[in-house]
Amino acid sequence: MLMASPPLASEKERESNETIKIRKPYNPTDMENKKHYNVVAAVVVDDGKYLCMQRCRSQYAYITEHWEFPGGKVEEGETDHHTLLREIKEEMDWDIYVGRKLGSVIQEYPDFCITLTAYLCKGGDKAFKLLDHLDYKWLAREELDALNWTEGDRKLLALLP
């Protein structure tokens, strides 16, 4: 059975179709073309509560003032362990004890990608300072979902003990 071809669109239909925004299909190479960072996070637990830090303003609106576990980018030649000690000292003037690895997640943001690796940590004896964050909270596991997390850190919640 022969099928008739669809009628050609009228000029009016063509004009209206030109204004429709078509979503670009997912292309796995898009992530490969972005800058990629290895990032580590300290999941600090004290008396059953998790330390959550609120980010400062950023050039990237999608992470500005969102919540995260403290940490930072792994520099060339650094181990994850050394990076955590350095970043927490720089951002909080605090010494921590780095424990076991909880796992890693990959997060693609509009401008870059990260592999985020979390470690279970214990805080040092003295109090920390807010040198690079707006605020902090100690929260029980069941309270964590209520925060406005960065997308990468939100994925880490599934790895928490």
Ranges and model annotations:
Residues D46, D95, S104-A127, D135-K137, ...:
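Active-site-adjacent beta-strand/loop module that shapes the phosphate/pyrophosphate-binding cleft
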